[in-house]
Amino acid sequence: MILFGAADPDDPAHVRSVAYLARLDEPGFYLAGFALIEFDIVMKSRGLNYRERMVRHALLARDYPLTTTRVKPLSPEILYLAARMEGEDRIDYFDAGVAAEAKVLDGHVVSTDRVFDRLPGLKRVW
């Protein structure tokens, strides 16, 4: 996941994650809202308390300010598609959300997760 890769300099995907976040200033590049939700929920599931999560979000905004503005809002259409993809394509909730956002926007997903390769109408970039 790009947000975890960017947040951890020791992560093997750090350099590439930072490079993709830097592209948020390009037309057509956006951060999936579902990616932000997943970032927070995974931190919570790993035992980070609310203050630790607040710090991580503040650092993300400080270090990568475009993550605060280059996020498309979620909509009923995206949530409908995400639910459909989760059930019919049998993919995980967050992957379905990211895929739905990409389908509504332009069909491109920046991810290391190969699940996106098998979804029609999507192109995974990494």
Model-derived regions, located:
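Alpha-helix capping/helix-boundary segments
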Residues: I2, A35, I78, V98, ...
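Acidic catalytic patch
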Residues: P9, G33-I37, A58-G87
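Acidic, PIN/NYN-like endoribonuclease modules and their adjacent C-terminal/linker elements
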Residues: D63, V71-K72, A99-W126
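A general alpha-helix detector
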Residues: I2, E38-V42, L81
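Short, well-structured N-terminal submotif of metal-dependent ribonuclease cores
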Residues: M1-L31, S45-H57
